[in-house]
Structures are given as structure tokens and as C-alpha cells.
Amino acid sequence: MNGEEEFFDAVTGFDSDNSSGEFSEANQKVTGMIDLDTSKNNRIGKTGERPSQENGIQKHRTSLPAPMFSRSDFSVWTILKKCVGLELSKITMPIAFNEPLSFLQRITEYMEHVYLIHRASCQPQPLERMQSVAAFAVSAVASQWERTGKPFNPLLGETYELIREDLGFRFISEQVSHHPPISAFHSEGLNHDFLFHGSIYPKLKFWGKSVEAEPRGTITLELLKHNEAYTWTNPTCCVHNVIIGKLWIEQYGTVEILNHRTGHKCVLHFKPCGLFGKELHKVEGHIQDKNKKKLFMIYGKWTECLWGIDPVSYESFKKQERRGDHLRKAKLDEDSGKADSDVADDVPVAQETVQVIPGSKLLWRINTRPPNSAQMYNFTSFTVSLNELETGMEKTLPPTDCRLRPDIRGMENGNMDLASQEKERLEEKQREARRERAKEEAEWQTRWFYPGNNPYTGTPDWLYAGDYFERNFSDCPDIY
């Protein structure tokens, strides 16, 4: 059995693990509240139903068809205990640990706060534009807060499109590679103000009590009016207590955003939790010019908000803070030196809000989640709408779109048995297609992206070939 044959995307019951500044956010939020009464089909937007219109703007569903399945009866330890330190691309997980979205739809969540891109495009000065781009980069990972379910691994050739006229963008993504798993995406402003694109290769590892996801791949944002391109890589995400205890998530690592035209750079440090949880969710950084002079300081939490201030005021505040910390210094935790064991890591207690330095400028604030989000996989309002299938959509979508994937649809509807059966069928179909290609010595041909080099960094990337929205889908593969 070769490397391809060893990889599983769909096995019965299992799944592999490659797997506000000067602008208001109020008009950017998806309207509505979650309602668990699934009989109210006109409100939740069940499969095949057309959302209503309000003032000419399409209203999207505000709930999933069924609440999430309980994970309390499943133990991940029996699966992961032999995998410490290993990459998880070939390790199967119970489907109960998934969420009813494809990874391609998860990537689309970058666009929830797309108003920050529109804002950047309208700002006259490069420093102001970088502030908004930095806020967008942080907001792009905010949806991962408390999202402990794993998205479904995309099948080779799977696609996802999203057009949001109310938010001013359209988006297309494709699973372009299976080994390694690579997802490519391209988005553009409907007013031709930006291009946003990249390719993501998520690398997952298990470290005993946690799973670490390193999102390899370059993210590129082009502001067309200013002839500017910004590139960066997302921080590492870690899910703690995957064996026992309450699951919790942190992001850590350094993100560098470079303006390739002006030389401005934003350096953002996503802080690891640290002792006593003092640094949990914190983001700190600065914007510098091409001569490395600090122009603007940034601070906040990726789960909450982002603020900025001039360097002099920031350093003055930090000096006072350090003096206070020295006076209040606590003794070390008595248990901090004990060996790692099967004891859960206590969920750190974070401060409720960010301490705002006087004179600071609000760059971004997270959208409030629906009241019953916890029963909907901790989805945001934007996320809840991603898999809705409206009347007539099947006639315009390619047959490879995630919305048409039956295992994800089954899980969304609360039918776990059907979801597992369909996963098994889809995986076997994918394996058979690989065997046929191997027999015929045929290479897989992507449809909407092609391999190349990023035009700004020179690193390997997948580039959009164009023409998707011409909607000629006659040569799309039958993957479902």
C-alpha cells in the first residue's frame, strides 16, 4: 500500500487530522439570533430554502438545523496515545469531534471582518492602512476562539464559493493537493478595491495533552487603488486538554506583515498563555517604517479587540505597569515543576477586558456571537450561514462545492449515522479514483488554481487561474 492509499479522509465514524476605529461594525453584522426550534424553517434557512429579503439585502439563516452532537461519550485517548510528537495527517478521529464545515469553509471565515479591508483601501496614509490591515490579520483568527471541533478535510478537487454583496466581496477556494493537503483561495472586492489570496497547508501535531496546528502558507492582500501588497503568515493554534479536562484554545507566535511597496512592517506577537494565564489571548506589536523606526504600537486580545497608540505613550504606560508588577510579584506555582502527566491543564482565567491606555485608538472589536452559539459548535453568525443551500443554488454551483457534500450535510442536520456512512463512501470513492489515476499514470489536474511562486515573496504558492465566475463547470470531477 503506497502513501496515498494509507491516507484516510472518510472512514466510518472517523476522520483524519491533516487536518472600532472611525468605522462602525454594527452594519457589518449578520442579522438575527439563534433559534433552536427547528420547526421554524423560514428562520433557520434549511437546505433548499431561499432566505428572505430585508430592504433589498438578503437575510441569511441564523441557526443550524440541529444542535451539535455530544462528545462526552467519546475518548480521544485511545486513538492518540501512540501518536505523541507525530504529524496527524494519517491519524483517524471520531466524527463526533468534527464540526459541520469543510476546511475550505473554515478558511472563508477570514472574510467575516472584511470591512477592515474596505477601510484600509479608503485611508490615504500608509501608516493608517497598515493599522487596518493588522486589525484584519488579527480578526481573521478570532473565529477560532472556543472552536474545538475539527473541520472536515476537503476532498481533492473540492471547492467552495461565497458571494456576499452586502459585505462587498466574492470568494473561491479549491483543494488543490492531497499529499500534502493544500487549500488555495482567492477573494476580490466587488468594487475592485482589493484582492486577497493564498494557499494553506495546515500541519498538525499531537504533544501529549494538546494538538498544535501550524498554518503554513503565505497570505497576500492587495489594495489595488494604492498599488500595495501585504503578505503574512498566520500564528500557530493550539488546542489543550484533548485527552481529559475542558478544551481550550490559544494562539501564539510572531506574525510579520510587510507592505512590499513602502517597506512598512507590522510585527505582532501572539503571546503564549504563560504562568497563571496572565498573557492568555494577548497580542502586542508595533508598526515600523522601512528604516525600522517604530511609528505605532498595537495591543489587545485576538478574542476581543485591538487598540493602538503612539510609542511614547505606550512605553510610559508599560514602565508604570512593570513597577506595579514588581510590587505585586507572586510566588511561583508549587506545581509548576511537576512532570507532565494525564492531569488536565487548568483553563487559564483571563482578564475580562483589555486595559486601555488613555489616548488609544480602537482598531477592531470582535462581533458578538449568537446567544446559543455553544450549542452550534461555537459558530459566529457569519459562520452559521456558510453551509446554507438556497433554492436554485444547485443549478449555479459546481458539483464540487462543499454545500453539496452529503457527509457534512448529514452532520449539520444531526444525522451522525448518515454522516459516517457518507464519509466512508466518499473516502472509498476517492481512493478508487486515485487507483485509477495510478493505473493510467495520469496526474490530477486542478481546475481553478495552478502552482507557481508568490509574486511578492517568491515562495511557492497556488495562484488563481481566473474564469471561475464564468460558470463553465462542464469539466468538473464527480467527487461526491
UniProtKB/Swiss-Prot annotation:
Widely expressed. Residues 15-30 have a biased composition (Polar residues). GO terms for biological process: bile acid biosynthetic process; cholesterol transport; intracellular cholesterol transport; phospholipid transport; plasma membrane organization; protein homotetramerization; regulation of presynaptic cytosolic calcium ion concentration; regulation of synaptic vesicle priming. Changing M93K: Mildly decreased 25-hydroxycholesterol binding. Residues 1-60 are annotated as: Disordered. Keywords: Cell membrane, Cytoplasm, Deafness, Lipid droplet, Lipid transport, Lipid-binding, Membrane, Non-syndromic deafness, Phosphoprotein, Transport. Changing I79A: No effect on phosphatidylinositide binding, but impaired tetramerization and decreased cholesterol binding, plus decreased cholesterol and phosphatidylinositide transport. Changing I249W: Reduces 25-hydroxycholesterol binding. Loss of 22(R)-hydroxycholesterol binding. It is linked to Deafness, autosomal dominant, 67: A form of non-syndromic sensorineural hearing loss. Sensorineural deafness results from damage to the neural receptors of the inner ear, the nerve pathways to the brain, or the area of the brain that receives sound information. Intracellular transport protein that binds sterols and phospholipids and mediates lipid transport between intracellular compartments. Increases plasma membrane cholesterol levels and decreases phosphatidylinositol-4,5-bisphosphate levels in the cell membrane. Binds phosphoinositides, such as phosphatidylinositol-4,5-bisphosphate. Exhibits strong binding to phosphatidic acid and weak binding to phosphatidylinositol 3-phosphate. Binds cholesterol, dehydroergosterol, 22(R)-hydroxycholesterol and 25-hydroxycholesterol (in vitro). Belongs to the OSBP family. This is Oxysterol-binding protein-related protein 2.
